[in-house]
Amino acid sequence: ANPDLLRAAAARGVRAAFIAAAGYGEGDGAGRHLQDELVALCDELGMVAAGPNGQGVVSPPVGMCAQIVGPDPPAGHIAVASQSGNLVSSFLNYATQTEVGISRAVSAGNAAMLGVGDYLEWFSTDAETAVGLAYVEGVEDGRRLAGQLRRATAHKPMVLLKGGVSADGQTAAASHTGSLATDDAVFEGMCRQVGVSRAADVEEAFDIAATFATQPLPRGNRVVVLTTAGGWGVMTADAIASSSLELATLPADLYESIDALLPPRWSRNNPVDLAGGETRDTVPQIMELVAAHPETDAVIFLGLGIQSNQARLMRNGPFFPDHGLDRIVDYHERQDRRFAAAAAEASERTRTPILCATELAVADPSNAGPEAVRSTGRLCYPSSHRAVRALDHLWRYARYREQHGLGSLQG
């Protein structure tokens, strides 16, 4: 039926098609022969086809969601291409959960005519897209893919997640999409050479892409950590030490400015433990001071949502809303909303990435803190380790652009 449908579509002026049906190149010799015939027909008709054996295509900016599995994500600036349709769905589900939206998404399937590299290269010139995100299982023409990725990363960041790393994974990939085995060390080297951010798993891949889509690139690798609790700061310092980032030394002028705003028991070092001094104005003021300082390249803010968590306990208690508890709850939630807004505003004014991390992003998504971060269009990270890993990729890509004379990102 597919050849007849393609001919009918071409007769009506259609120049692109998505083929969802399986039974082609991922199967036996007969299926591969059918796939070759399908490609020849598309060439004859002057059409391009995505698939076959794919789940669909999505373009939220124009309201299109044409895929088998149903995630309908918000519009945003992450473009997805994948050799697995269900991985597309995974990324779209994360976009829906985090409210960091999607510009385009396509399941490449068997990639009979168009491979992941073709999509990523097109994404790099798409005005709606800030970052490309892809899942691949195998590479048939490594030299061609490397060229496509090098051209793409000259314009925009590209994030890749690779399946089929182990022998068992390669066997599964061969039966899934007909992908050829790829030496992982060679693939890793290719990613580094062409400036691609390679992720270790689905969560990291989306974190990296969402960070590229919503944060400015850092000017350098010096990070200041602002925290409402010492332990979180210690763990974040460890994570930074394991990355290409550095825990910034507080310059004397910045130290003195912070010291004037916080109680005497503050940590007097980086990480900056606010020591209970997070009042309505001090957090926004310190965030602005730190982000604007020329010796700060990025900020990680920990502890957002604690006050709203206390408010939740009060709201659910037997005495609410009496005894002034309604006013206390409102105050705590407004505090967290103010801190989230201050982080986004300071980041935009200073062009410094400011990442907010709290486990409440997943433990209590309705908490006013994470909810307020989402309302600014940014990602609220479930842990500081995930924030550090994403920020590390931003710095590596910024350094790649600098080393290759690519200039600043446009838009």
Q: Model regions: which residues?
A:
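Catalytic-core regions of core metabolic enzymes
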Residues: 1-411
